[in-house]
A protein has these predicted regions:
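Short amphipathic alpha-helical leader/targeting segments
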Residues: 25-26, 37
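Surface loops and adjacent helix of pleckstrin homology
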Residues: 26-28, 69
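Intrinsically disordered, low-complexity, charged/polar segments
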Residues: 47-106
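Generic alpha-helix detector with strongest preference for long hydrophobic helices that associate
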Residues: 4-6, 38, 73-74
Length: 106
């Protein structure tokens, strides 16, 4: 299988194409790396291909914050410039500039 190149980077703020949530990327798997049960739980009309990057997000919607795994095909850049209000942001990232978060080097 060919190595996939990720379209998004750690720290990028993104939004879901089909569902009303957004988040910041904190990790990436370059191909599907979750359970088959999780995969089958995704509605068929938006179920992604497995041969693409999957991003781990600190996510939020109007009601809650949570962590989400989302395929590249279901993500868009979030250009709202609004910060993500997730309680784990400060544990992973040092700050925000424009539409992305960054980590300071150790």
């Amino acid at each position: 299988m060919a190595i996939q190149k990720a379209k998004f980077s750690i720290g990028d703020i993104v939004k879901h194409k089909h569902f009303d949530f957004r988040g910041v990327i904190y990790d990436v798997d370059f191909e599907f790396n979750n359970s088959e049960e999780w995969y089958q739980s995704i509605p068929k009309n938006v179920r992604p291909r497995k041969d693409q990057p999957f991003y781990h997000l600190l996510a939020e919607n109007d009601e809650i914050t949570y962590e989400a795994d989302v395929s590249e095909q279901n993500l868009l850049v979030d250009d709202s410039d609004e910060p993500i209000k997730h309680p784990l942001i400060e544990e992973i990232f040092s700050g925000k500039k424009g539409s992305s978060y960054f980590k300071l080097s150790n």
